[in-house]
């Protein structure tokens, strides 16, 4: 597996753990497998890799939690996904295609490029009153409520 593919895969798993953690009390490998449509053995291999990289912890019950580094990476990836998806939808791209394209683009953008895209996106008229802006705030608020974590 190439470095890019490994990086993209890791970011997708971390993003999935964050999404699940925002909607349920505990995250297990089976939850990730169901969300992504992957086999449980594939997810288990990925979780082992993420644990070795210091991105997640797995307790005795098999519950998965993001470490500080994992949370930062997951938040960054998810924020890119939300901003890019909604920017593309505002440009007239269908929601499905926008989500698929955002998932591919989010892994290759430099931090500088993403910040400029986000700045432009946040200047759109009425954005602060929109559901998509509220989703960004939810990400920020969730990350700040995780013990030991700060945005």
Regions found by a protein language model. Give the residues of each.
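C-terminal regulatory/oligomerization modules of transcriptional regulators
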Residues: 106-151
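Basic, amphipathic "hinge/linker" alpha-helix immediately C-terminal to the N-terminal HTH DNA-binding motif
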Residues: 62-80
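Glycine-centered, phosphate/nucleic-acid-interacting loop/turn motifs that mediate DNA/RNA or nucleotide
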Residues: 54
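The short coil/loop that forms the "turn" connecting the two helices of the helix-turn-helix
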Residues: 37-38, 61, 93
């Amino acid at each position: 597996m190439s470095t890019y593919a490994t990086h993209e895969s890791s970011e997708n798993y971390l993003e999935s753990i964050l999404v699940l953690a925002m909607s349920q009390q505990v995250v297990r490998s089976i939850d990730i497998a169901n969300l992504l449509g992957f086999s449980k053995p594939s997810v288990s291999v990925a979780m082992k890799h993420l644990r070795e990289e210091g991105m997640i912890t797995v307790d005795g019950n098999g519950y998965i939690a993001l470490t500080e580094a994992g949370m930062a990476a997951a938040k960054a990836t998810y924020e890119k996904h939300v901003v890019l998806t909604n920017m593309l939808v505002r440009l007239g791209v269908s929601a499905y295609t926008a989500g698929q394209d955002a998932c591919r683009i989010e892994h290759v953008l430099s931090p500088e490029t993403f910040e400029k895209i986000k700045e432009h996106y946040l200047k759109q008229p009425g954005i602060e009153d929109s559901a998509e802006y509220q989703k960004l705030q939810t990400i920020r608020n969730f990350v700040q409520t995780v013990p030991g974590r700060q945005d």
